[in-house]
């Protein structure tokens, strides 16, 4: 059986934690930040963890993990 390929979009956008959760960057931080308040900018500063339902899908798209 041939090797499975990892989706290239997953390689660029996600990282796996040590416990197997999936991290992603938060959207809405590229431009036009002057129109958002300080709370929005502060809360979107860090990465976020993907929900458990999407977690299964992303792991299927990266069958051998992300190194």
UniProtKB/Swiss-Prot annotation:
Ribonucleoprotein found in the keyword field: yes
GO biological process: translation
Disulfide bonds: none
GO cellular component, one term: ribosome
Recorded GO MF terms: structural constituent of ribosome
Pfam families assigned: Ribosomal_L35p (PF01632)
Record carries keyword Metal-binding: no
Keywords, sorted A to Z: Ribonucleoprotein, Ribosomal protein
Source superkingdom: Bacteria
Family annotation (NCBIfam families): rpmI_bact
Family: Belongs to the bacterial ribosomal protein bL35 family.
Protein name per its UniProtKB record: Large ribosomal subunit protein bL35
Gene: rpmI
């Amino acid at each position: 059986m041939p090797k499975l390929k990892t989706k290239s979009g997953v390689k660029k956008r996600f990282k796996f934690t040590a416990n197997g959760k999936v991290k992603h960057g938060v959207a809405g931080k590229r431009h036009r930040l002057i129109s958002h308040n300080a709370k929005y900018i502060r809360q979107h500063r860090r990465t976020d963890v993907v929900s458990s339902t999407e977690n299964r899908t992303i792991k299927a798209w990266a069958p051998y993990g992300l190194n």
